[in-house]
Amino acid sequence: MEFKTNDQSLGQIRIYILPDDIGRGVVARTRNSLRKDMRKLLTEIDIANSTWVGEWDEGSPVAHLDASLDKKEEDQASLFYLFNTLPSPSPIPELVENNVARNAMYGLLDSAVAGLNTIMHQYQRRSAALMLQRESQPSQTVDPRLTAVIDKKGVAWYCDFDAATCLREPRQYENSTGGILAETMGLGKTLICLALILATKEISSQIPVEFSVGTIPVRERTGSLKDMAAAAVGRTGAPWKSYFATLEEEGYDYFRCKEAIKKYPGHYFIPGPVPRRQSRNPIPKQARKVFLTTATLVVVPSNLVKQWELEIKKHTTGLKVLVMTKSKQILPKAEDLAEYDLILFSKQRFDMEATDGLDKMGRSKSTTFNVCNCPYIGATRERDCTCFKVEDTYRSPLKQLHFKRLITDEGHSFGNSSRTARTEATTVIDFLQVSARWIVSGTPTKGLYGAEVALGSSRSTSSTPLPSNEADDNGQLLGKVTNSLAALKRWDSYPADVNQQEMAFYKEERKDLEKLGNIAAIYLKAKPWSNSLEDGDYASWSQYVLQPRHGSKSHGNMDCLRSTLEGMIIRHRPEDVERDVILPPLYQSVVNLEGSLQDKLSL
């Protein structure tokens, strides 16, 4: 700290901050009172160069360390605007280290995918390729809670204003191997997903790093070269089917090799849960054996199952598909499920897998007693026992497989879930082992949709075609759509009820952000938002992402919100789509429908 006086009444203090990641072994930083003082200090510091050198007066503007404090509220972009100005997908195959995945990306970008009957548009190729890139080579990103600041020497350091933490080197997280495919309705999201599944048809899921210890077997005696090679193929998930198929076309016979590979499927073990209470004679929980597979799970609403079946038949050839829609339809065994390329579930049938660990009466081991109090049969000493029995519980075959990916069509309903409000679907998702998770929805939340949709909606009373030049420039398009939102911030041009209009808009925007947070934490398991209190690095979505306009306890900044959205969502801007395909004129007209008796009664 340095102190300097300008005159008898004014002075300045130069403050030097010791980053939290320096001197951790000798400097204690556990006192909450000091952390609270640091938080207050960080909001008051003026980092302007003129202030640093002493060239300031009482009228000089303050340049806060937290730049968001210097921005006017009307300068803050809305969530709708951010969603519609996200950068269009730009996949880079060269960043993918895995040769098989990189070649699959090139195949997607060229629309040269084996088994794909349809030639994709350029924007569809880019979206599918970026999905594969995120699955195969998730990038490292700076913790979105941190803000980069440049010190007086021109060196960057990082600050978490809410936690009052300063770091010389930033914390980094691996981006989620999934996200939200949010292309506008009608742009072929189903085709994009099918192309991704076909392009990675032979790419298996991989053993998670945290469970990889001990996966290399120790044999009692040296195995044959064939068996050891087959075990290595299964353990590493190396693609082998097309390789042998090509050689067999030349007249070679690899039947014994293929049988050996099937004999040694890749697998790993998940340790049993740690008991909550210590006991003198603890009973160790048995580890769960999980097998690797190339299968993709697809969960869709019941009314879209037929559409997916038709799209699969129309666009693909050679996919081995299992459709699960009926409540009484029993799932095949795990080893049989692993042979499918695509397992299509209706949402209702998928939710039924939440009964794992329950008997037919909905009881589990943790909710029942071990003492039988059932009545006797007549005058005999034999009980009419209906007690819970572990052998009578349902065991979902899905728990025995590590799937390559999970795709949920119209999965925005997961935004209604939370850490405390659980549903059957979230229960199933929690016990599933999946390498990548995707939600497919053009409207991830109620207020998030394409600007072109909003413009079309505003013209719904007109039967004239949409002029093509109105959609040529995305900035003009967004300007037309968001004009009313921007006007709400011009307090002098609206009557007194503008406060109510703006508050209603912010309330709906807060709901949209909360739903996105639930999707990120509950479904996508995106770091750091999925961290729990037990992890010691809990990140509150409401604190870091929600903006001050959304509540008194929200201190999020726009950079954090923007980086979070860019890491989650894949969608094209309207002008980038129109460069690839010229759509016919859009005609809209209002058609009045006579309501049925049920419609009238519901009113």
PLM features per residue range, with description:
Residues 123-129, 338-340, 355, 438, ...:
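Inter-lobe connector of SF1/SF2 helicase motors
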Residues 185:
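The conserved Walker
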Residues 204-408, 412-421, 493, 545-549:
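SF2 helicase/translocase NTPase motor core
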Residues 188, 413-417, 446-447:
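Catalytic P-loop NTPase motifs of RecA-like helicase/translocase cores
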Residues 101-182, 191-265:
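Conserved pre-motif I regulatory segment
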